[in-house]
A protein has these predicted regions:
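Short basic (Lys/Arg) and small-residue
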Residues: 120
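Short cysteine/histidine-rich zinc-coordinating motifs and their immediately flanking basic loops
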Residues: 142-149, 174-178
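Structural recognition of the conserved hydrophobic beta-strand(s) that form the central parallel beta-sheet
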Residues: 94-102
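Anion (oxyanion) recognition and catalysis
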Residues: 17, 90-91
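Short, cysteine/histidine-rich loop/knuckle motifs that typically chelate Zn2+
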Residues: 132-135, 166
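Conserved ATPase-coupling elements of RecA-like P-loop NTPase cores
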Residues: 74-89, 104-110
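Conserved P-loop
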Residues: 1-65, 104-115, 125-128, 154-177
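Conserved P-loop NTPase "ATPase switch" module shared by AAA+ and STAND
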Residues: 64-78
Length: 178
């Protein structure tokens, strides 16, 4: 959504790792933007990243034992199994960080994000620049150019735009491509 989710998460992740914590960055296998590595929108490569199954993230659990900090990037794309994985990691004393969109472009709850938010000790809601009025830190919603598919795809910047509530609720339906 271009709200700096991955960049902000990377900053928190690296802060923990500086203090001798061993960290791992997990991304869903549906994210195929950069094969074998995780790259943020600002083209920063995330060290120690691993792609895991979006459908069955629990299969990665045994591999996570050596890590102190576990990051789930684009958490909205993981199945509901992510909830039991996060609970298990928390019981093991791990620091768990997740980023993702709360809502689809159709304003439906995105994946299991509402459950993850319920378990969060801290929630940071980031906003993007509205693609209609260009107001900074105002866009909280996404809309797809394809009205028949309201789900935002990972890395699909050409498939969707971000919009602030004011522009989204105006009587005139706006599209930055018009």
């Amino acid at each position: 959504m271009f709200a700096t989710k991955s960049q902000s998460t990377r900053f928190i992740y690296e802060k923990y790792c500086v203090f001798n914590r061993k960290g791992i960055w997990l991304k869903p296998d549906t994210d195929n933007r950069c094969e074998g590595k995780t790259v943020t929108h600002d083209n920063r490569v995330i060290a120690n990243a691993m792609t895991i199954s979006a459908v069955s993230p629990e299969s990665a659990l045994p591999k996570l034992a050596p890590y102190d900090v576990v990051v789930f990037d684009e958490a909205q794309f993981f199945s509901e199994q992510i909830i039991s994985v996060v609970k298990s990691l928390l019981k093991m004393g791990k620091i768990v960080i997740a980023n993702g969109l709360k809502l689809t472009a159709g304003d439906s709850i995105f994946g299991s994000m509402h459950y993850l938010l319920a378990f969060a000790d801290e929630i940071i809601s980031l906003k993007a620049v509205c693609n209609i009025c260009n107001k900074v830190d105002s866009a909280t919603r996404t809309r797809t150019y394809n009205k028949n598919n309201p789900t935002v795809k990972v890395g699909g910047s050409g498939d969707y735009f971000v919009i602030c509530p004011n522009c989204d609720t105006s009587n005139e339906k706006k599209n930055p491509q018009n």
